[in-house]
């Protein structure tokens, strides 16, 4: 699908369809008012007859409106004007895209980017429209033998901006929006792949392909079990012992800043391509969704794709920690004591608290890069889902400025995170009689004690932890990966690269 921006008046558009907003109760947006004036009150007469109230998501498709060059006008309800916030704006865009696609409008000029969204500029509105449009049109049908496609799909979308001065920022918004949307799609595709296809080897092959596609800036190295053993990554290796699939750690290095002083930002993604729970096996119900336990790695992969696509002038390293947690004759057990790469020992009380055992070794491994900051992304705890539900990602950090930066980026991107504490009081719950620490700390504050566990391996750099257990995928009828937090991390890196969207 093609996107572009222009600045023009609605009556001069020769497009197949013009999209304008209507507020409650039956109030025309400024652009809709212009069209109403040209058509001698045709639109307002329809509203007076009760054809459209203007409630969020309501639509009315008009054909051959008098004195208007465009074949169709799509009126879309935007709710009350003062209540049009970021969430509602995105819902209106989503409804617009779905309606255009369903009604066979192959091209459209959208004036919704001229609506006032509190505290948001044209760049934000255009970029969010692009990302939302791509999200609305996403489908995962690679493994279906029959694919359903609309007869006349939407192919071209033009966003109108209020002044010619804003064309440049609109074009940049499209460029950024497309790159982020492609990263989200890549993350969703990886997440939705079944575990018999998407194992650690598959993740590694995707990482290598990324380096092939962006060979100018990206180098990928894949570290296998033998090398991990030599590095002393015994905790990571223990988790994969029960699986026939080899554990593989894929390290994707992107260099956008040639300066020797430029330290990299490191992103670490938990890549449990299937988590049965191991010997502490999970219940059968919903176990199929444990293919999504690699959504952290999928998100990191998506972000690395975005960074390479936009050629950001920063250095970023993405680590996909690929592994599979299965029961078997070689599987690690409750009661085992593991020696981590850092030298610290861990008593395993539950083999289903495996993500932290993989991440702790990777967090030690990345010390060699002397990072500016390290952010790990993981579907880590069910406790985070209890604390924050399925709408907001959990954030913990040992560095206040980094935490504030990430929270700010999450608000900018509309991919929200909320900070949880990392107090020393919680560390007591991880005490063990037989090792330096236990791998679980009981039910109270489970998301926080998991963060506290990881914090013991991140003392040499600024670090943040994103627990995406509640936000990485949806269950039920709309089951599928969400691609979060690609948008959040993309915004964070855009800000670091000097593209914060404040035109």
Curated annotation (Swiss-Prot):
Keyword match Ribonucleoprotein: no
Record has Calcium as a keyword: no
Q: What is this protein called?
A: Probable cytosol aminopeptidase
Superkingdom of this entry's organism?
A: Bacteria
Chief subcellular location: cytoplasm
Pfam families tied to this protein: Peptidase_M17, Peptidase_M17_N
Which cell locations does it reside in?
A: Cytoplasm
Q: GO CC terms for this protein?
A: cytoplasm
Per the record, the gene is: pepA
MF terms (GO), sorted A to Z: manganese ion binding; metalloaminopeptidase activity
Arranged from A to Z, the UniProt key words for this protein are:
Aminopeptidase, Cytoplasm, Hydrolase, Manganese, Metal-binding, Protease
